[in-house]
Amino acid sequence: MDAILKASLPKLREKLLEALQAVLPIVAIVLVLCFTIAPVSPSILLCFLLGAVLIVVGIMFFTLGAEMSMTPMGERVGAVLTRSRKLPVILGVGFLLGFLITISEPDLQVLANQVPSIPNQTLIFSVAAGVGLFLTVAFLRMLLGVALPPLLVAFYGLVFVLAAFVPREFLAVAFDSGGVTTGPMTVPFIMALGVGVSAIRGDRHAADDSFGLVALCSVGPILAVLILGIAFRASDSTYIPPVLPEVSDSVELWQLFHEGLPEYIKEIASSLLPIVVMFGVFQAVALRLDKRTLGRIAVGLAYTYVGLVLSLTGANVGFMPAGNYLGQVLAGCGMPWVIIPIGMLIGYFIVKAEPAVYVLNKQVEEVTDGAISAQAMGMALSAGVSISVGLAMVRVLTGISILWFLIPGYAVAIGISFVVPKLFTAIAFDAGGVASGPMTATFLLPLAQGACVAVGGNIVTDAFGVVAMVAMTPLITVQLMGLAAQLKTGRRRAARAAEPALAGVAAYADWPDDDIIEL
């Protein structure tokens, strides 16, 4: 165990630098706003800065912990499931995994508290059942080699048909639920499951199908909340604003975070427990890993736990009040439109601070053998989230229904999916769920809520939906990146095909078609 801890120290330093690069731009933007057009109280600023420190340290531990534990656990469980060749076992365990992991997702508790017209347990269990059901659908797709785009057309078509019968107050929350439930606890494990299942297949399309699980799992919660929206009255939906902190000295500042810490210690422990228990069962029955591997996974789980506790404490206690207050000040400064470009700037950088984004980017780079670099993936996500936040702020200022954005957005995203390589489509729809994590829920959503309060809008219908918007635009930007790569590859092949003709060496008419058009 000591050797494992010592070996992880250089990696921790590397992860610390990555975390600083992700969080410092957000801190810089907020500080510039605080000292210029959006003055805030010292209490809120100090809470924000201490929250930023906790988030940096938390991301450092979480990203390394996920590499050491969540990813290998998911890959091994997925491989064992597929190797069993028993479809009822694969689907049954898949449903159970999806259900248990979702119940333990911390962000789902936050969503449930924002929808008082539906009992918390009813909402949580319905959403968890939706994720479990669609995880089994995702497993079936991978095992049978079914293309992702037709499934997306069918399921999102059903979503928008149901949306026509749901009260307006439920629409934004329903679409938010799809992004909220694919958070830092769910994503690493589910993505690793996909890699494990596809690795056993071993055919030429296995890498393409290793992504797409998060994409399908995001549909389940949306359908669940829409169905609940038809069954429950929306008149009781209310918005509970976050309490703005007031501290007079450093001791009170620490006490504020110290009071929130036990809650997140308990939340994350209950979140990790189902995954650990499930892995323990697999270890006893089928895996039987050696002690060194188990020791590495145990250290990784400890890092994951510490990282998530620190990140969520910093985000909820430090970032959430700051986001809400900044939104109120910016939208109430006499030039409310200024929140649109500022929101876009914050959105561009804040996605880099999402813990699960690191897992996605790294896995994409590994599965594609570097064809899609983590840097390129990060830029596509940042561009998508920036556009999302800008559109969300337009909604806050105008009160336009979220469907005017989501229906065209998903139509474009699904339309593109039929012309880009399958791998890019699966990655793009996974990226949408990954980008809308805890940083979106604890900073961007409060920013929109604060702005909505300042302009006198309806919080439930106009401010909610930020998570849904953030989950939508990466579907388009990542696929456009794939389309650009496809066109670039096509031009290179065309240039290579033209060289013999230009040199008068050989006739290209006899070349096999596959050499010319296969991408």
Q: Which residues fall in each region the model found?
A:
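Signature of multi-pass transmembrane helix bundles
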Residues: 1-64, 79-80, 178, 191, ...
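Small-residue-rich segments of transmembrane alpha-helices in multi-pass membrane proteins
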Residues: 26-30, 58, 86-94, 154-165, ...
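Transmembrane alpha-helix boundary signature
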Residues: 39, 62-73, 99-111, 168-170, ...
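Transmembrane helix-loop boundary segments of multi-pass membrane transporters
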Residues: 46-47, 65, 112-124, 142-157, ...
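Structural signature of hydrophobic alpha-helical transmembrane segments
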Residues: 48-60, 117-129, 176-190, 242-243, ...
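Helix-loop-helix junctions within the multi-pass membrane cores of secondary transporters/permeases
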Residues: 78-79, 87-158, 336-417
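Alpha-helical transmembrane segments
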Residues: 135, 139-145, 170-171, 195-209, ...
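Hydrophobic alpha-helical transmembrane segments in multi-pass integral membrane proteins
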Residues: 165-173, 225-233, 311-318, 390-391, ...
